[in-house]
Amino acid sequence: MRTAVLSTLRPLAGLLLAAMLAGCGTQASQPSPTSSARPRSTATLSIVQPKNDAVVSATTMLVQFQLTGGEIVAQTSTHLTPNQGHIHLSIDGRLISMNYQLQQDVSLAQFAPGPHTLQGEFVAIDHAPFNPRVIARMIFDYEPSG
């Protein structure tokens, strides 16, 4: 009886294994609908101030961006428009502000002395990135005086 059951299950196990292996094919993954549905932007973003590798000694740093081909809008919406949005400013990967202007004073009081990465990203009016992303980044060295 046991031999009969095993001889019946072996072909089923083989079919199951073949089906599992077929599901693990080498097809290229498709982009997710979310990433392919993001609006495109032809805008470019650069950091005007501070300059790359600047040494900052004050506890407040003026950050100034230049945005070309895009428009800063002070609204949030799910009706996405290419090249309209605002700037997310981060230091060392930590979001500092969602900025609706091209310049702002940033407090450095909570940061340790040493090198830091400043990044600005021009994002759509729903706070999500464009596709491709519009990013500017630079390194500055924070050396507080006193």
Language-model-detected regions and their locations in the chain:
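Short amphipathic, basic-aromatic surface patches that mediate peripheral association
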Residues: 66-78
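Bacterial signal peptide processing site
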Residues: 25-27
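Short acidic/polar inter-strand loop motif in beta-rich domains
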Residues: 123-133
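Bacterial N-terminal signal peptides that target proteins for export
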Residues: 2-13
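Surface-exposed, short loops/turns at beta-strand junctions within beta-sandwich domains
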Residues: 109-115
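C-terminal motif of bacterial Sec signal peptides marking the signal peptidase cleavage site
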Residues: 20-23
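Short, compositionally biased P/S/T/A/G/V-rich stretches that sit at domain boundaries
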Residues: 29-58, 146
